[in-house]
């Protein structure tokens, strides 16, 4: 068990284990977005930083087929931040909130040595999509194209530059695809830690393994911060799922099926390194 899973296991209860905690039709989710851990201010504008901080949190709501309604922001700002940079941050938060019809209802601000952001999203759902629910011989698929986020991160780490529309900066969420497909999906989650690592979470939740029908390179499958959807569904619904992908203009790649076997994650955890 890696250190992240070990720590989470200390608080194990029925609400922990999904992208958010589901309680009476309400989904509560929270993620951190810290300078020098998730980003550097030389990589992105303050506006882009705020946008991404909101989007990675809204992604958790969408992954559970929930409608985000409210946000609480905690922002630790460096003491030398300027008013114009503060305005950029505020505009980034507000523009994403407006796009997804989310009301920012409060939070906290403190002075810090660097820029650290945590966001709590409160969402509602009538048909939650959870990680638990898939069965043996179900199909496994992901949306979009994965692997580019890690490549662009590598460029930034090596003092290179990336396109302004890079997936590392501009996250595309799959709310329409999830909404129209939810009735057919047996389980799902967003790809935040990388395909192989998030498959490990599905395997653990459902006590299954996977038989791959497509070869996926380790460099692509270990790419984190993709925020595409990882889903499973009955093979009898394959045509219906393809129709829904076309309807929502979403690329859907079916790459495996679930089997009764132990799954081994080939990627190293990037949360805790020794």
Where would I find each of the regions flagged by the language model?
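Active-site-proximal betaalpha loop/short-helix elements
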Residues: 80, 168-226, 265
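Acidic, Ser/Thr/Pro-rich beta/coil linker or hinge segments at domain junctions
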Residues: 168-172, 245-274
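Glycine-rich anion-binding loops of enzyme active sites
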Residues: 33, 69-154, 257
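Short, compositionally biased
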Residues: 151-168
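Helix N-cap motif at beta-to-alpha junctions
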Residues: 232-239
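N-terminal glycine-rich phosphate/pyrophosphate-binding loops that anchor nucleotide-derived ligands
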Residues: 1-62, 102, 126, 138, ...
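Small-aliphatic-rich amphipathic alpha-helix that forms the alpha element of a beta-alpha
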Residues: 46-71, 91-99, 174-176, 180, ...
């Amino acid at each position: 068990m890696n250190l992240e899973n070990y720590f989470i296991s200390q608080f194990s209860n029925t609400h922990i284990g999904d992208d958010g905690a589901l309680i009476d039709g309400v989904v509560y989710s929270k993620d951190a977005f810290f300078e020098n851990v998730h980003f550097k201010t030389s990589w992105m504008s303050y506006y882009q930083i705020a946008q991404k901080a909101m989007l990675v949190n809204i992604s958790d709501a969408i992954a559970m087929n929930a409608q985000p309604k409210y946000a609480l922001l905690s922002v630790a700002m460096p003491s030398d931040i300027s008013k114009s940079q503060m305005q950029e941050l505020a505009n980034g938060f507000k523009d994403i909130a407006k796009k997804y019809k989310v009301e920012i209802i409060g939070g906290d601000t403190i002075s810090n040595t660097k820029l650290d952001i945590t966001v709590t999203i409160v969402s509602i759902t009538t048909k939650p999509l959870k990680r638990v629910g898939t069965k043996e011989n179900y199909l496994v698929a992901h949306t979009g194209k994965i692997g580019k986020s890690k490549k662009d991160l590598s460029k930034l780490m090596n003092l290179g530059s990336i396109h302004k529309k890079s997936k590392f900066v501009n996250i595309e969420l799959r709310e329409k695809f999830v909404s129209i497909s939810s009735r057919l999906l047996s389980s799902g989650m967003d790809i935040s830690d990388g395909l192989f690592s998030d498959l490990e979470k599905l395997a653990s939740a459902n006590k299954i393994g996977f038989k791959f029908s497509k070869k996926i390179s380790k460099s692509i499958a270990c790419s984190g911060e993709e925020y595409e959807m990882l889903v499973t569904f009955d093979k009898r619904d394959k045509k219906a799922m393809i129709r829904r992908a076309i309807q929502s203009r979403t690329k859907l790649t079916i790459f495996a099926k679930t089997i009764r076997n132990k799954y081994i994650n080939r990627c190293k955890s990037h949360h805790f390194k020794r």
